[in-house]
Regions:
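Acidic-and-aromatic substrate-binding clefts and catalytic sites of carbohydrate-active enzymes
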Residues: 13-19, 97-104, 216-224, 248
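Short acidic/histidine-rich active-site segments
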Residues: 41, 170, 237-248
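Positions that flank functional sites
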Residues: 43-44, 174, 215-216, 247-248
């Protein structure tokens, strides 16, 4: 008998999502999911509206501004819906992006007692665009590798901070570098720091996410792929979640 769970989903409270909390819960029940979480975006570096940051054109991902409003609103809506929900193991969640880029805000969200589940994600390096927006074909390959080095370094610091339940989509940039742009990347130069990321998570009793969004995209593989999942397990990791990263 198959047990299906989905621990990474978004609603219209995410700027790039659609639908209501109630619609998501109804669909999860219809699918017979054994566990289900809504994890709307809370990209901490976009806490305020664009004008707060001086130059609203500085970063391309303008839709994400204002997370200080839409993320708490998602938590409220989820919590209220859960009070009269039956027949579904539902976890009120959030996807906490770039927490160390606004640590005060991240601490505030992470301490919300209504939350059952926090995904810690890293979508963009400090002062850079989301990996989704970067023009890799216009860059020297060494620049791409430098971005990835900073990516894993900042991810490690987030894991050391530790106010998360699972690490989201470890290999997120490959969705765009390899999947969309067709640029092949060898992650071997980052083996040591990835091991350190996993060991940090394991020491803190945290898990990793298998984000299956890559299977329905050009990348064609989960994030991370099986090799990294096996490494996490070999190092002593025991906590895995699976998430569709659905935005509707």
């Amino acid at each position: 008998m198959k047990t299906l769970i989905d621990m990474h989903t978004h609603t219209g409270f995410s700027p790039d999502g659609e639908g209501t909390v109630e619609q998501s819960l109804a669909k999860a029940k219809e699918l017979g999911l054994a566990a289900f979480a809504i994890t709307d975006h809370c990209d901490c570096n976009f806490r305020y509206k664009a004008d707060h940051y001086g130059d609203p054109e500085a970063l391309k991902d303008g839709m994400m501004y204002g997370s200080g409003e839409y993320a708490p609103a998602s938590i409220v809506a989820q919590y209220e819906a859960a009070q009269h929900l039956e027949g579904l193991n539902f976890l009120c969640g959030i996807e906490l992006g770039q927490p160390l880029q606004d640590i005060e805000f991240a601490e505030e969200i992470a301490s919300d007692k209504r939350l059952d589940f926090i995904i810690g994600s890293h979508h963009q390096n400090k002062g850079k665009d989301d990996f989704y927006w970067i023009e890799y074909k216009n860059m020297d390959l060494s620049q791409t590798y430098a971005l990835l080095e900073d990516y894993f370094k900042e991810m490690l610091e987030m894991c050391k901070w530790g106010k998360l339940d699972v690490l989201g989509h470890l290999t997120y940039p490959l969705r765009y570098i390899q999947g969309d742009c067709g640029i092949q990347i060898d992650l071997a130069p980052y083996d040591e720091i990835i091991r350190e990321i996993f060991c940090t998570l394991i020491q803190k009793g945290k898990g990793i996410e298998i984000n299956v969004s890559g299977l329905r995209q050009k990348y064609g593989k989960p994030l991370p792929d099986l090799g990294f999942v096996k490494l996490y397990k070999a190092l002593g990791g025991e906590i895995l979640t699976i998430g569709s990263d659905a935005h509707c």
